[in-house]
């Protein structure tokens, strides 16, 4: 198995909140996105340990050393991008993720990461393009559908956002954040779909999503 450091951001848009539980590493199916450069097991372990400790300088140096061995390694670029983002270097992170998809367009995590970074910049249409490309590469990526829903919701495309959230839940019924976002969407309808909003909020809570006092007050009205 190979490993990919995963980027998690909090994105706000027109009443929807995408929020993930931070997990520094994620396993990827062998062959799905390539491998790290050969003979870099120790470097990979060093980078992973540094990432867990939020030692961005050490993690960055490890991935840069990997790239000195293979400048076109998409996975190393993706991991370096995650380090740069966590270190607060959004521009550098974006450059790394762009390199990643240049060398391996099938790396869905990098398309999602680019979408989140563009969203944070306020570039909604570019973010929408990135999430759409992620879905093109893997139509069953529930996170990409959730992120796309948030983006198109910010443009007022509520029906399309609802469809994307429903698809995310269909793909992953235990995707608590998608249930939470769908609850918010139903709450913001005119008139609000109270029963559906309550249903999905309760489901989100049962899946580990924290309480939202503002939403709870609105649901109690």
Feature-to-residue mapping (PLM):
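Sec-dependent signal peptide recognition
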Residues: 1-7
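Terminal, low-structured helical/coil segments at or just beyond the last alpha-helical repeat
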Residues: 20-32, 180, 184-221
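Alpha-helical segment of the N-proximal tetratricopeptide repeat
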Residues: 38-72, 79-86
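Helix-start (N-cap) detector for alpha-helical repeat units in TPR-like alpha-solenoids
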Residues: 40, 74-75, 108-109, 142-143, ...
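Canonical tetratricopeptide repeat
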Residues: 45, 79, 113, 147, ...
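Structural marker of alpha-solenoid helical repeat scaffolds
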Residues: 69, 103, 137, 171, ...
């Amino acid at each position: 198995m190979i490993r990919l450091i995963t980027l998690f951001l909090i994105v706000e848009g027109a009443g929807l909140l995408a929020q993930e539980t931070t997990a520094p590493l994620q396993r990827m199916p062998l062959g799905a996105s390539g491998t790290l450069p050969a003979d870099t097991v120790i470097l990979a372990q060093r980078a992973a340990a540094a990432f867990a400790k939020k030692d961005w300088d050490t993690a960055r140096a490890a991935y840069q050393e990997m790239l000195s061995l293979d400048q076109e390694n998409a996975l190393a670029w993706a991991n370096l991008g995650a380090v740069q983002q966590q270190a607060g270097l959004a521009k550098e992170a974006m450059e790394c993720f762009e390199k990643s998809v240049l060398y391996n367009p099938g790396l869905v995590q990098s398309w999602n990461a680019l979408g989140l970074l563009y969203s944070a910049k306020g570039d909604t249409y570019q973010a929408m393009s990135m999430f759409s490309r992620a879905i093109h590469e893997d139509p069953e990526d529930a996170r990409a559908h959730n992120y796309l829903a948030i983006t198109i919701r910010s443009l007022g495309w509520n029906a399309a956002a609802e469809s994307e959230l429903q698809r995310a839940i269909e793909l992953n019924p235990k995707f608590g954040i998608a249930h939470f976002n769908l609850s918010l969407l139903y709450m913001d309808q005119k008139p609000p779909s109270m029963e559906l909003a309550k249903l999905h909020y309760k489901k989100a809570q049962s899946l580990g999503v924290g309480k939202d006092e503002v939403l709870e007050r609105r649901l109690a009205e």
